[in-house]
Amino acid sequence: MKAERESLESYEEEFTLCNKLGLHLRAANKVVRVASRFSSDVWLSRENLEVDAKSIMGLTLLAAAYGTRIKVRAKGVDARAAVEALGALIQSKFEEED
């Protein structure tokens, strides 16, 4: 029963995009690479639109510019780690120079 409970772990946090270009293609590619390291299902959402964080096409649909609040949500055994890793990427401005 414990393993089943762990597989259903869900975690979410909100972050603000603080890089000048927002969630552009290069940044979206980095999100996909980080999210794909985890077995959990991972989503990013903006307002009423939620997309798979492992899909670059989905991420481009968010059209998230500088200052946009993004919710990162994950469900699975490593949900918290996935959200924290993506949060660190977002807070690092996608490791890009301003």
Regions inferred by a protein language model and the residue ranges of each:
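Short, intrinsically disordered low-complexity segments
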Residues: M1-E4, L25, S45, V72, ...
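Positively charged, low-complexity intrinsically disordered leader regions
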Residues: K2, S10-E12, C18-L21
